[in-house]
Amino acid sequence: MIDLHMHTVYSDGDKTVEEILKLCEEKHLEYISITDHNNCMQYKDEAFNKNIFSGKVIKGVELQGSVLNKCIEILAYDYNIDILSEWINKYFSEEKLRERRNNQKVRFLEICDKNGLKYDESKIIYPKKVTAFIERSIYDEIIRYEENREKLGEYAKHFGLFYRKCLTNIESPFYMNYTIDYPTYEEIVDSIHMAGGKAFLAHPFEYKFNNTLEFIDEIRKIRELDGIECYHPSAEEDNRINILKEYANKNNLYISGGSDYHGSPKPDIEIGSGKGSLQIHKDIIEKWHRD
């Protein structure tokens, strides 16, 4: 089995690289990729020198971008780490992340004010890591109040749902325009290819679009993808994995997959198995990865 999508303390996960490698070894995974958001620092971690994990590691990173007024993520694999890191630093350096985080806080609170949501700004805790989402901290503050939870309804259940259906949904009164924060989809794909890597659309059903396959068709007209992440917890139900695999095969796209493990931020997700039924065989990478 393999798992090509997981996060550590280098982005918004809560496990160190060493802890992740130990978990992957315990699960007897054959291939893994640690795909932290918008940086490749995880691969410079000293844990890789400790012979903790006996399987093989594919370099990966998850890059945030915008396309058609929507926020998406692109998974890059098998890239030249120096070349891609140089490009990433233009958009996601520590200085830029701090500036962006401050701007996003102001914009999110303006949205809260406009929608009559109660909050105490002094209770909003800045994450220690600049790679973590300030929006999650603000969300944790607003759902402390019962009147806010009543207004948000089902979107008060967890941040991921609020992020996908409200903050990044142009039709929502809580929409926050992330297109000014992130590189475009085509810039990301071009940069991955310049670094010799392959670009996969991450978790298509995670975005909760009305017509996921039509959306993939549209962005492929802008820039062709190398592949799609067909195996993901968001696709574990309603035959979605097979729907994506069928689309990928029909359109000559490669297939990838992973649990999107974060640790306690996503407590229902386990490495290697997602929500429980995710099983990803290594044969899916035979067409696009060579050791």
Give, region by region, the residue ranges found by the protein language model.
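A metal-dependent hydrolase metal-coordination microenvironment
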Residues: 1-144, 227-251, 256-268
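Secondary-structure boundary motif
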Residues: 26, 48-52, 194, 221, ...
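Conserved, well-ordered alpha-helix/loop/beta-strand core segments that scaffold catalytic motifs
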Residues: 171-218
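Amphipathic, non-transmembrane alpha-helical secondary structure
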Residues: 18-25, 186, 190, 213-221, ...
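Surface-exposed cleft-lining segments at the edges of enzyme active sites
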Residues: 124-130, 162-179
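Active-site core of metal-dependent hydrolases
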Residues: 198-207, 225-235
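Structural recognition of alpha->loop->beta junctions
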Residues: 216-231, 269-291
